[in-house]
Amino acid sequence: MIQMQTQLEVADNSGARKVQCIKVLGGSHRRYAAIGDIIKVSVKEAIPRGKVKKGDVKNAVVVRTKKGVRRPDGSLIRFDSNAAVILNDNLQPIGTRIFGPVTRELRNDKFMKIVSLAPEVL
């Protein structure tokens, strides 16, 4: 469950290390984002010579949450941290590598690239 002001780790090699959610996209008064939802983020911490720099405002997709995701069979997939992958204006990932596992819920036509780059899909 990601909302405004939530700090997230970045699960790609775009150069950002920490981002903060500044808006949950999709609806005028939408409060929470779950895995697979697109949010607007501000880069709070970045490495030198990265593709993004501190203060940049980008779109991102949530790939891991502490809240987790409930599957139709009743199982719950949870993670130790909240993480996102930074996207460009065409909603494609900026980075060329994904770190850590992602869930099967990302496996739709929009985020197939993230699933294929991920080392593990749960």
UniProtKB/Swiss-Prot annotation:
One of its GO terms (cellular component) is cytosolic large ribosomal subunit. Keywords: Ribonucleoprotein, Ribosomal protein, RNA-binding, rRNA-binding. GO terms for biological process: translation. One of its GO terms (molecular function) is large ribosomal subunit rRNA binding. SMART domains: Ribosomal_L14. Pfam families: Ribosomal_L14. The keyword Ribonucleoprotein applies. InterPro entries: Ribosomal_uL14, Ribosomal_uL14_bac-type, Ribosomal_uL14_CS, Ribosomal_uL14_sf. PROSITE patterns: RIBOSOMAL_L14. It comes from the Bacteria. Belongs to the universal ribosomal protein uL14 family. NCBIfam families: rplN_bact. Part of the 50S ribosomal subunit. Forms a cluster with proteins L3 and L19. In the 70S ribosome, L14 and L19 interact and together make contacts with the 16S rRNA in bridges B5 and B8. This is Large ribosomal subunit protein uL14. It comes from Pseudoalteromonas translucida (strain TAC 125). The gene is rplN.
